[in-house]
Amino acid sequence: MTNIRKTHPLAKIINDSFVDLPAPSNISAWWNFGSLLGICLILQILTGLFLAMHYTSDTTTAFSSVTHICRDVNYGWIIRYMHANGASMFFICLFLHVGRGLYYGSYMFPETWNIGIILLFTTMATAFMGYVLPWGQMSFWGATVITNLLSAVPYIGTDLVEWIWGGFSVDKATLTRFFAFHFILPFIILALAAIHLLFLHETGSNNPSGIPSDSDKIPFHPYYTIKDVLGALLLILMLMTLVLFSPDLLGDPDNYTPANPLSTPPHIKPEWYFLFAYAILRSIPNKLGGVLALILSILILAVVPLLHTSNQRSMMFRPLSQCLFWLLVADLLTLTWIGGQPVEYPFIAIGQLASILYFMLLLVLMPIASIIENSLLKW
């Protein structure tokens, strides 16, 4: 009798994706982040579901309902902080996953890469709307500032903003719809992740060397299942350390003050994982220009495969490109730092330089470095 996991229509899909999947024998720990993102997503959906059971999306009670969850609901505090810090872990894994893709040339799978970009945008939208729900000062003003950016759209801008708000300011209608979208989007992310995986399994995984590995494949189970379990344990260890020892480390103290439309916080800033994009937005004095730069800071990933000029796929054997890659990492860390600083000298100048360098690296310097490396190999 044939094994049921190989014959049953549903079990067969799972078997071909997680058990008998042929995987390259040399993929490193940088390939763990796909499974870690899956774990993060499931964790966020589960904790979010339990939070939604007690949360009320009304401007008068939203802040109180979150307080109620933390004070009165059984283990509500841990669910709330696991959800809030789970988002941070999610984005850490996301950035490392994208960074891995850039370094090892995984973007040469165009369908997988493009679905990944859509996933990144969707996750950022979900996180933004989730940040609005506790209805603290930073929630309210963050929502006001970011949605207001759409008013930069020529001709229809103002109408567009009021349509999203459901009125003439961020109010009850805005909060209710943000809650509805924040609830549904993770399930859309789940579906997109399945498509992401589907496209990946059409080609098979890339590997650190960037060389086709068809001649040297090993079964996913038990080798990579046990490796993923180790990654998952480390992820949960980091998350729970954060949740149990310093749950508010990555949050903003202003969000413990209920939203007040009459009092603006001294420094409006988003969560840490949006600071790099926020810094790019603020670096451009023109409103529409800033909004375009903000969108392009992520959308630029879509042109990376088109600008791949190297004869090699991976950066593993390309020292010049490696230097530029790590310069890009340092640049993004600089932008993250600048995004959290007030708009004054010298932060404005540093932010503008870092923003220019970011686009220069991806659009100009890296493709040129690849061409230089190609010519060096001909000597």
Swiss-Prot record:
Keyword terms of this UniProt record? Electron transport, Heme, Iron, Membrane, Metal-binding, Mitochondrion, Mitochondrion inner membrane, Respiratory chain, Transmembrane, Transmembrane helix, Transport, Ubiquinone
Q: Where in the cell is it found?
A: Mitochondrion inner membrane
The note on cofactor binding and number reads: Binds 2 heme b groups non-covalently.
Which superkingdom heads the taxonomic lineage of this protein's source?
Answer: Eukaryota
Q: Name the InterPro entries for this protein.
A: Cyt_b/b6_C (IPR005798), Cyt_b/b6_C_sf (IPR036150), Cyt_b/b6_N (IPR005797), Cytb/b6-like_sf (IPR027387), Cytochrome_b (IPR030689), Cytochrome_b_C_euk/bac (IPR048260), Cytochrome_b_N_euk/bac (IPR048259), Di-haem_cyt_TM (IPR016174)
Query: Cross-referenced PROSITE patterns, in alphabetical order?
Result: CYTB_CTER (PS51003), CYTB_NTER (PS51002)
Please verify whether the record's keywords include Secreted.
no
**GO BP terms, alphabetized:** mitochondrial electron transport, ubiquinol to cytochrome c
Where, by residue number, does a ubiquinone bind?
H201
**What cofactors are annotated for this protein?**
heme b
Q: Which GO terms describe its cellular component?
A: mitochondrial inner membrane; respiratory chain complex III
| Major place of residence | mitochondrion
What other facts are recorded? Heme 1 (or BL or b562) is low-potential and absorbs at about 562 nm, and heme 2 (or BH or b566) is high-potential and absorbs at about 566 nm.
Q: What is this protein called?
A: Cytochrome b
Name its species. Answer: Aonyx cinereus
